[in-house]
């Protein structure tokens, strides 16, 4: 077992917070699972995708590497990752389905015709990157470095889509809140490790990892504000029509 996953060898101070750590990890897993399910439901409700295929293919590639190729030995982590992978396949299918029929895809003939190839090569490309990082750094370090990058990409692209479209179809407060909760607990669990087991996890407490965490919080915070504002504008427009 790779050092860092073997909690039996951890110092007494870490063992004291181990139940909290597993709780945070479980809450993060549940939050993202709810996000994926809510994303599917919202896309079918509005007949419009609300997330970026770039971010989704990146997430799926990460899940393939760390749920199948380098699965963590912790049973709870293994179950969570494979649950994400299973549901994320349907998220990508649903998103691609409605992206193909959207006006954006219709105005881009190449994307409209070869969307399935863009998705496939996107997954393969990101998979190779996550795998390469796991070889370079070690699976456990790549798990978190790549994971933090995935959080920032997902939050940044979600904000970009919302601002670019100027409407909230395909999106919901539930998608945003579950994404934020899932991500914030994942970040908290990482820094909890570095605080109480610095001999093994000290590498994760550095300026770049803090930047990733800060970027995610800022981007998702801005998303919440922009979503609230856009919803208000939409409600005013409906009131005028009525």
UniProtKB/Swiss-Prot annotation:
InterPro entries: PaxB-like. The chain crosses the membrane at residues 20-40, 50-69, 79-101, 117-137, 143-163, 172-192, 207-227. Pathway: Secondary metabolite biosynthesis; terpenoid biosynthesis. It is found in: Membrane. Its EC number is 4.2.3.-. Belongs to the paxB family. It is an enzyme of class 4 (lyase). The gene is cle7. Chevalone E derivatives produced by this cluster are interesting candidates for cancer therapy since they synergistically enhance the cytotoxicity of doxorubicin (DOX) in both MDA-MB-231 and MCF-7 breast cancer cell lines. This is Terpene cyclase cle7. Keywords: Lyase, Membrane, Transmembrane, Transmembrane helix. PANTHER family: INTEGRAL MEMBRANE PROTEIN (AFU_ORTHOLOGUE AFUA_5G14600), PTHR42038. GO terms for cellular component: membrane. Non-reducing polyketide synthase; part of the cluster A that mediates the biosynthesis of chevalone E and its oxidized derivatives that possess a unique five-membered lactone ring and can synergistically enhance the cytotoxicity of doxorubicin (DOX) in breast cancer cells. Within the pathway, cle7 takes part to the biosynthesis of the molecular scaffold by catalyzing the cyclization of the prenyl group initiated by protonation and ring-opening of the epoxide to produce the chevalone E intermediate. One of its GO terms (molecular function) is lyase activity. It is a multi-pass membrane protein.
């Amino acid at each position: 077992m790779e050092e860092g996953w073997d909690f039996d060898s951890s110092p007494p101070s870490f063992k004291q917070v181990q139940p909290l750590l597993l709780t945070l990890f479980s809450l993060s897993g549940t939050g993202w699972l709810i996000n994926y399910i809510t994303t599917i439901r919202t896309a079918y409700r509005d007949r419009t995708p609300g997330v970026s295929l770039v971010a989704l293919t990146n997430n799926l590639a990460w899940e393939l590497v760390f749920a199948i190729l380098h699965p963590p030995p912790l049973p709870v982590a293994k179950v969570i990752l494979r649950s994400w992978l299973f549901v994320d396949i349907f998220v990508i299918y649903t998103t691609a389905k409605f992206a193909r029929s959207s006006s954006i895809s219709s105005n881009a003939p190449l994307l409209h015709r070869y969307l399935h190839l863009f998705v496939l090569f996107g997954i393969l490309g990101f998979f190779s990157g996550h795998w390469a990082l796991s070889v370079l750094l070690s699976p456990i370090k790549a798990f978190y470095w790549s994971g933090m990058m995935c959080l920032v990409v997902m939050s940044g692209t979600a904000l970009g889509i919302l601002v670019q479209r100027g409407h909230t179809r395909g999106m919901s407060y539930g998608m945003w809140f579950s994404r934020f909760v899932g991500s914030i607990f994942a970040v908290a669990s990482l820094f909890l490790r570095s605080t109480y087991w610095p001999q093994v996890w000290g590498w994760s407490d550095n300026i770049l990892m803090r930047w990733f965490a800060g970027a995610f919080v800022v981007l998702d915070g801005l998303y919440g504000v922009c979503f609230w504002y856009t919803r208000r504008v939409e409600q005013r427009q409906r009131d005028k029509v009525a």
